[in-house]
Structures are given as structure tokens and as C-alpha cells.
């Protein structure tokens, strides 16, 4: 059996988009009804992906805005990023673009493993960001995308499996011309 691989994942996005709800639902299998702004929490969970065991450290961050400074602990030693927006908030969707730019500037790279997550998919009557907009952004960034509902535990595990997939894509690149591209779930 292959040795366990360690991976650090940062969950970033605007305030009140459900970063903590996604993380707690994934790690502890329950939805937190009340809202308490997060300063920062770190969770651990073992993930099995394609037969490989991953010991993950998931850093649930405070909400970002355009004036937030990306903390170096959110870039140094981080293997991948889960960028979360609320499907009910166009401004939170715009904020993931700013956060990604900050990550790329801070890391000095053109690409990092990212999954973009449109959270609160259960609030479809209040939708402000279409699935097509989310998919288009993921295609532009050559990254993974999914919508999720932390409340109903829909696609929550999928979001974290996708970030492991993106991380492994970087760690074990495919030969050129294999026709593989973005993953949209």
C-alpha cells in the first residue's frame, strides 16, 4: 500500500458564503445553523482518492474582501485552494476573482490547484450567479468547479475530492496532448 500523502488546503472567499459550513459538513458531517464569523480554524480529515490515502489539513479562513491582505500562512505550504462564493451573491462571485489574483501574486505563479465552489445551491430562488457563469470562470482558469449545498450535504465531499484531483494533477502532470482539461461537476 502506498504511503499516506499529506496535503494542506485553504478555504477562501467572502464573508457569509458558507466556507465554515462546507468545511464542518465535510469533516464533522453536520450543518451549523447559526452564523459566527470565523477568525480561522484548522480541521484534519483523511481522504481516500483513487485508492490513495491523503491526510488533509483544511484551513477554514476568515472572510476576505478586496482590502484583505492574503496571509502568508494561506499560501506557504498550501497545496490547493477551495474558493467559495454564494450563488445568491454576485459580489461574492466577483470576490473569488480578486482572491485568486491575490493567491497568484503571492505565490508568484500563473496557476495553482483550485476548485471554485458555488455554495448555497439549495437557495435556487435567490440565485444571482448562474451555473454557466461558474463553469465559464472555471474554464477560463483551467480549474475545477461545482455547486454545493452545505445545508443539504450536496456535492460537499465532491468539492474536496475535486481539490485533491487538482492538486494531484499538478503533482503528477499528464503528458502534453492528452486532451484532458477542466473538470466540471
Curated annotation (Swiss-Prot):
Subcellular location: Cell membrane
Alphabetically ordered keywords of this record: Cell membrane, GTP-binding, Hydrolase, Lipoprotein, Magnesium, Membrane, Metal-binding, Methylation, Nucleotide-binding, Prenylation
Gene3D superfamilies to which the protein is assigned, alphabetical: P-loop containing nucleotide triphosphate hydrolases
EC number: 3.6.5.-
First and last residue of the signal peptide: none
Protein's UniProt keywords contain Magnesium: yes
Residue numbers covered by motif Effector region: 35-43
Residues binding GTP: 16, 18-21, 32, 35, 38, 119, 122, 150
Gene Ontology MF terms in the entry: GDP binding; GTP binding; GTPase activity; metal ion binding; protein serine/threonine kinase activator activity
Reaction(s) catalysed by this chain's protein: GTP + H2O = GDP + phosphate + H(+)
InterPro entries per the UniProt record, alphabetical: P-loop_NTPase, Small_GTP-bd, Small_GTPase, Small_GTPase_Ras-type
GO biological process per UniProt: positive regulation of L-arginine import across plasma membrane; positive regulation of TORC1 signaling; small GTPase-mediated signal transduction
Gene Ontology CC: cytosol; extrinsic component of cytoplasmic side of plasma membrane; nucleus; plasma membrane
Propeptide: 183-185
Main location group: membrane
Residue positions binding Mg(2+): 20, 38
Membrane topology: Lipid-anchor
Residue numbers of Cysteine methyl ester PTMs: 182
Known role: Binds GTP and exhibits intrinsic GTPase activity. Regulates entry into stationary phase when extracellular nitrogen levels are adequate for growth.
Family, as annotated: Belongs to the small GTPase superfamily. Rheb family.
Name the UniProt record assigns to this protein: GTP-binding protein rhb1
Lineage of the organism: Eukaryota, Fungi, Dikarya, Ascomycota, Taphrinomycotina
Gene symbol of the encoding locus: rhb1
Amino acid at each position: 500500500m502506498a504511503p499516506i500523502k499529506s496535503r494542506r488546503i485553504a478555504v477562501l472567499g467572502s464573508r457569509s458564503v458558507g466556507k465554515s459550513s462546507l468545511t464542518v459538513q465535510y469533516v464533522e458531517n453536520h450543518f451549523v445553523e447559526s452564523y459566527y464569523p470565523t477568525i480561522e480554524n484548522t480541521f484534519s480529515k483523511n481522504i481516500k482518492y483513487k485508492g490513495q490515502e491523503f491526510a488533509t489539513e483544511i484551513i477554514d479562513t476568515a472572510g476576505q474582501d478586496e482590502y484583505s491582505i492574503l496571509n502568508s500562512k494561506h499560501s506557504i505550504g498550501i497545496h490547493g485552494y477551495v474558493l467559495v462564493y454564494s450563488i445568491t451573491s454576485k459580489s461574492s462571485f466577483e470576490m473569488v476573482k480578486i482572491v485568486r489574483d491575490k493567491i497568484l501574486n503571492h505565490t508568484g505563479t500563473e496557476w495553482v490547484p483550485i476548485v471554485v465552489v458555488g455554495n448555497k445551491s439549495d437557495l435556487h430562488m435567490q440565485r444571482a450567479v448562474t451555473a454557466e457563469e461558474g463553469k465559464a470562470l472555471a474554464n477560463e482558469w483551467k480549474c475545477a468547479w461545482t455547486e454545493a449545498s452545505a445545508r443539504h450535504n450536496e456535492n460537499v465531499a465532491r468539492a474536496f475530492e475535486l481539490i485533491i484531483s487538482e492538486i494531484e494533477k499538478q503533482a503528477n502532470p499528464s503528458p502534453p496532448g492528452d486532451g484532458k482539461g477542466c473538470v466540471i461537476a
